[in-house]
């Protein structure tokens, strides 16, 4: 009887994937990123093991949104104190900190566990075209 092979954490060979966000739709790009971070594109995918690849996103500030999302969509933060709710529109967040925008979207698509936090650490986002990971990049 053949048993299904389960990947072990020390057997996984991770790759570095660079994605250029310029001119791409945000949501479609982020689903691709979540799949790569989770490792679901691999034949040895195991749900309880972090088997995803490192993902480097460049030109994050040049990503495209459909519809009126730039003006209408809002992101809220709350410190826990009364009256401390702050909101930013998508356009403000994209101009000030595009890295945070990509990290928030990826966090929503990954598991809400220790494993998900480990997966999120493998996401590297840069607003411009330059990144310091040229030595590691394989794809």
Curated annotation (Swiss-Prot):
Example of a GO biological process term: translation
Lineage top rank: taxon: Bacteria
Family: Belongs to the universal ribosomal protein uL13 family.
Coiled-coil regions listed in the entry: none
Lineage: Bacteria, Pseudomonadati, Campylobacterota, Epsilonproteobacteria, Campylobacterales
Keywords associated with the record: Ribonucleoprotein, Ribosomal protein
Pfam families in the cross-refs: Ribosomal_L13
GO molecular-function terms, A-Z: mRNA binding; structural constituent of ribosome
Originating organism: Wolinella succinogenes (strain ATCC 29543 / DSM 1740 / CCUG 13145 / JCM 31913 / LMG 7466 / NCTC 11488 / FDC 602W) (Vibrio succinogenes)
HAMAP family: Ribosomal_uL13 (MF_01366)
Name recorded for this polypeptide: Large ribosomal subunit protein uL13
